[in-house]
A protein has these predicted regions:
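Conserved alpha-helix/loop element of class I SAM-dependent methyltransferases that forms part
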Residues: 19-40
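Class I SAM-dependent methyltransferase SAM/SAH-binding core
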Residues: 52-97
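A short acidic, Gly/Pro-enriched loop at the edge of an enzyme's catalytic core
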Residues: 97-108
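A short SAM/SAH-binding and catalytic strip from SAM-dependent methyltransferases
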Residues: 108-119
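A short glycine-rich, Lys/Arg-flanked "PGG" loop and its adjoining helix->strand segment in the class I
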Residues: 122-137
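Short, glycine-/aromatic-enriched active-site segment of Class I SAM-dependent methyltransferases
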Residues: 143-160
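Short alpha-helix
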Residues: 162-176
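Conserved Class I S-adenosyl-L-methionine
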Residues: 184-234
Length: 234
């Protein structure tokens, strides 16, 4: 089963933000981050799993120093994102195999609906810690399991397969050397996007997400959406 963001009908409905909440969630993450590590507009941000670059363009329009990273070159990167010295602010790399950056160079890493689809989340979190400056932040939004503890098992290839409970997301971050400073439920954003998919006739996309009810584990899992801030500990 393919990941949800690869489906044309999902991209058509979600636009340039392949996740719940769009820029509202992005802005919320940055606002929360300022409580623990305010590097100002000059702070360096990397958007891992940036997709078509919607968050990169949004934050650069605010004057932020932000770059995007994804596993493939996206044609949308050239649209609406001014190049600096002829170079677009994007990198192509496998985030789990190694980020193409020196140690301690970033103030924040954005992971918006990314951790749950990574093949090796622990390896990525170790890399994230390496490239963040002391006190730097990992700002995440992702699917999480609001019901029983543990990873969703009925949907082994959909986006919801990697969703974890709050306790499990926290434990993963702590094992990699982060302290989770804030965690909040943002499930209404997930509900709005799910409703849009149904309204526009993309019900199959709900199955990709693991939100199709008891047949794929949706009812038992109570999948929700959350955002959290984790800080690099020394």
């Amino acid at each position: 089963m393919s990941q949800l963001y690869t489906r044309p009908e999902f991209r058509r409905i979600a636009g340039e933000h392949w996740r719940p909440g769009g820029t509202e969630i992005t802005d919320r993450l940055l606002a929360l981050g300022r409580r623990w590590h305010d590097a100002g507009p000059e702070g360096r941000i990397l958007d891992v799993g940036c997709g078509p670059g919607g968050s990169v363009r949004h934050l650069r329009q605010q004057g932020r120093q932000v770059w995007g990273l994804d596993t493939v070159l996206r044609p949308q990167w050239r649209a609406g994102t001014p190049a600096e010295a002829g170079v677009l602010p994007y990198l192509v790399a496998d985030a789990c195999a190694g980020l193409p950056l020196r140690d301690s160079v970033l103030d924040m890493i954005l992971c918006e609906c990314v951790l749950s689809v990574l093949p090796d989340t622990a390896a990525f979190l170790r890399e994230a810690r390496r490239v963040l400056r002391p006190g730097g932040l990992l700002a995440c939004s992702d699917l999480y399991r609001r019901g029983e503890e543990g990873i969703l098992v009925p949907q082994p290839a959909g986006c919801a397969a990697g969703a974890r409970s709050r306790a499990d997301w926290t434990a993963l971050c702590e094992e990699a050397g982060f302290a989770v400073r804030h965690f909040e439920d943002a499930s209404p954003a997930l509900a709005r996007l799910a409703a849009a998919l149904v309204w526009y006739g993309a019900r199959q996309s709900l199955r990709e997400w693991g939100l199709c009810g008891p047949g794929c584990g949706g009812a038992e899992a109570r999948p929700g959406y959350a955002l959290w801030i984790a800080q690099k500990e020394e």
